[in-house]
C-alpha cells in the first residue's frame, strides 16, 4: 500500500533515466530533437544497422537534405516499440518530416524474467497494459496462449503499480555499469547507431561455427521470397498495431515509412500489410536474391545482423530507395 501511495505522490517519469539504451537515447534526443527531421525506430536491426551519417549524406547527394537520428533499441518487440514511439512523438521535433519504423509483429509476449526490470516496468502503465491486452486478445492464438501472454504483461504492470523497482533499488541498480556507459558513449557519438564489433560475442561465435546452417536458412528464405504471397488478410491485432503506429506518426506531422530489414525471419507481415493497403510505404530488403550483398557470409556479424561494413551498404540502399 505504501509503495502504491508513493507512486501517486511521486509519479514515475514516462521514460526514467535508468533504462539502458532507451534512457540515454531519449535524454540525448530531448536535448537535440529540433535538429532532426527524420527518426528511425525499431530493434537492433535499426540500432546496429542504420547509420544516420551515411543515410544523410547519401540522401543529400541525391538532392534531399535530411538530418536523422537512430532511435533503434535492441530487443524491442511490437508492443513496446509502439509504446516508445507514442511517448517520443508526444512532443515531436518542430521540423519532423519522416519517421521510419521496423518491428516483428510477434505474439506480444513479454519475457517473465523481465517483469521486475526497469525496462519492462517503466512502460507498463494501465493504459499501455490495456493496449497490450487488446493486441493479444484480438490475435489468432489459442485461448490458453492468450492467457499466458496476458500474464506476462500483468506482472510488470502490478510491479510498477507497487513501485517495486523504486523501493528495492538495492537489487535493481539505478546506475549504468562502466561497460554500459562506454557503449552509450559510442551510440551517442553516432546519432544513435552502434556497430556490432565484439568478436567474442556468443552470437558471433555461434555464427562462425554454424555457417552451413546460415546458408541453408538463406536458401529457404530465398524460396519463400520468390513465392507469390497469398491474398490473406493479416490478423486483426497486427492491423490494429500498424494503424496505431501510422496514426501516431501522422499526428506528429510526419510521413510513416515502414522498413523490412535483411533478416532471416520467414514472416511476411509487412509485405502483406503493404499489399493490402494497411501501410502506404514499405522499403523491403528481406530477399537474398534481390540483395545478395546483404546476405553474404562476410557481410554478417551473426545470422540475424549485418556487420559494420554491410550496415554502410544497407544505409546507402535505404537512402537511395527513400529519395526515389
Can you describe what each PLM-predicted range is?
Residues 48, 74-80, 233-236, 260-269:
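Acidic-and-aromatic substrate-binding clefts and catalytic sites of carbohydrate-active enzymes
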Residues 1-66, 83-84:
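Membrane/wall-proximal cationic-aromatic binding patches
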Amino acid at each position: 500500500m505504501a509503495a502504491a501511495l508513493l507512486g501517486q505522490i511521486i509519479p514515475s517519469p514516462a521514460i526514467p533515466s535508468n533504462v539502458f539504451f532507451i534512457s540515454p537515447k531519449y535524454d540525448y534526443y530531448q536535448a537535440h530533437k529540433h535538429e532532426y527531421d527524420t527518426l528511425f525506430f525499431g530493434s537492433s536491426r535499426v540500432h546496429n544497422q542504420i547509420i544516420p551519417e551515411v543515410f544523410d549524406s547519401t540522401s543529400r547527394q541525391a538532392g534531399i537534405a535530411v538530418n536523422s537520428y537512430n532511435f533503434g533499441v535492441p530487443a524491442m518487440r511490437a508492443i513496446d516499440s509502439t509504446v516508445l514511439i507514442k511517448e517520443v512523438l508526444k512532443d515531436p521535433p518542430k521540423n519532423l518530416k519522416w519517421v521510419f519504423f521496423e518491428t516483428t509483429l510477434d505474439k506480444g509476449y513479454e519475457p517473465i524474467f523481465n517483469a521486475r526490470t526497469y525496462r519492462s516496468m517503466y512502460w507498463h502503465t494501465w493504459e499501455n497494459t490495456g493496449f497490450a491486452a487488446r493486441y493479444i486478445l484480438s490475435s489468432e492464438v489459442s485461448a490458453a496462449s492468450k492467457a499466458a501472454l496476458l500474464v506476462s504483461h500483468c506482472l510488470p504492470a502490478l510491479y510498477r503499480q507497487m513501485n517495486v523497482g523504486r523501493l528495492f533499488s538495492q537489487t535493481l541498480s539505478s546506475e549504468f555499469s562502466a561497460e554500459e556507459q562506454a557503449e552509450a558513449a559510442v551510440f551517442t557519438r553516432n546519432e544513435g547507431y552502434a556497430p556490432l564489433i565484439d568478436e567474442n560475442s556468443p552470437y558471433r561465435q555461434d555464427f562462425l561455427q554454424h555457417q552451413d546452417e546460415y546458408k541453408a536458412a538463406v536458401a529457404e528464405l530465398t524460396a519463400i521470397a520468390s513465392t507469390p504471397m497469398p491474398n490473406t488478410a493479416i490478423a486483426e491485432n497486427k492491423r490494429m498495431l500498424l494503424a496505431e503506429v501510422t496514426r501516431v506518426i501522422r499526428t506528429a506531422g510526419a510521413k510513416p515509412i515502414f522498413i523490412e530489414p535483411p533478416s532471416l525471419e520467414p514472416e511476411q507481415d509487412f509485405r502483406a500489410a503493404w499489399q493490402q493497403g494497411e501501410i502506404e510505404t514499405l522499403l523491403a530488403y528481406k530477399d537474398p536474391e534481390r540483395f545478395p550483398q546483404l546476405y553474404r557470409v562476410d557481410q554478417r556479424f551473426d545470422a540475424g545482423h549485418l556487420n559494420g561494413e554491410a550496415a554502410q551498404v544497407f544505409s546507402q540502399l535505404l537512402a537511395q530507395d527513400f529519395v526515389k
